[in-house]
Amino acid sequence: MSDLISALLLGILEGLTEFLPISSTGHLLIAEQWLGRRSDFFNIVIQAGAILAICLALRQKLWTLATGLGERANRDYVLKIGVAFLVTAVVGLIVRKAGWQLPETIQPVAWALLIGGVWMLVAEHFAGKLPERDVVTWKVAIAVGLAQVVAGVFPGTSRSASAIFLAMLLGLSKRSAAADFVFMVGIPTMFAASGYALLEMYKEGGFGSENWTDVSVAFIAATLTGFVVVKWLLGYIKKHRFTVFAVYRILLGAALLLWLPAA
């Protein structure tokens, strides 16, 4: 397979999995077993494509918040986004300084996919018994920030899955409201993570030699795919549960665990 096709597929995969509750990092680590390992810079660029995608998909909400800060409800919402982001940033930096690194084997990812799928089924079952609420509390904001760190430490967990379902269990029980808040928190989180990674790369000697055609194709693929996925998902969850994603995670995790001994 050519490097260009590989880059295209990885970009599409990033766009497909970044916002679905199935773990983009986990899927990229799995895909690299067949498509080849890419540079950290390449991975940062395709995540930037996903960032652009969600900004475009949520542009109306972003504009409403930016121009409506005079309203107390909008200020409160933005402050809670900020708190969730700060929790992620501070705890994430502590974890990073402690020497955490992504796993180089598939087994931890497989277990995270499997356990995360079960967690989704259980969490949605109990959240479904709560009265439907769309108010973001400070408790929810802090929990979402912590959930993002957990997802970063355990690839395969999924940032959106862990954060959305924890938010639902803690009172933000309306699925669409929980997803909206988690996606909004994801924007500064992904911006900061990408910026921090680029700064670290620069300090260590630059970005190395890259095939800019491959990088550009992957970026565009991630942006376009991510935009379509976000718009579709936000419509889907208004009428449907996350069950199909939970079942997919369980099946994929189990299949990988069965495949690993044979491989």
UniProtKB/Swiss-Prot annotation:
InterPro entries, alphabetized: UppP (IPR003824)
Name of this chain's protein: Undecaprenyl-diphosphatase
Lineage: Bacteria, Pseudomonadati, Pseudomonadota, Gammaproteobacteria, Lysobacterales
Membrane topology: Multi-pass membrane protein
Role description: Catalyzes the dephosphorylation of undecaprenyl diphosphate (UPP). Confers resistance to bacitracin.
Gene name, Swiss-Prot/TrEMBL: uppP
Main location class: membrane
Species of the source: Xanthomonas campestris pv. campestris (strain ATCC 33913 / DSM 3586 / NCPPB 528 / LMG 568 / P 25)
Enzyme Commission designation: 3.6.1.27
Keywords: Antibiotic resistance, Cell inner membrane, Cell membrane, Cell shape, Cell wall biogenesis/degradation, Hydrolase, Membrane, Peptidoglycan synthesis, Transmembrane, Transmembrane helix
Origin: domain of life: Bacteria
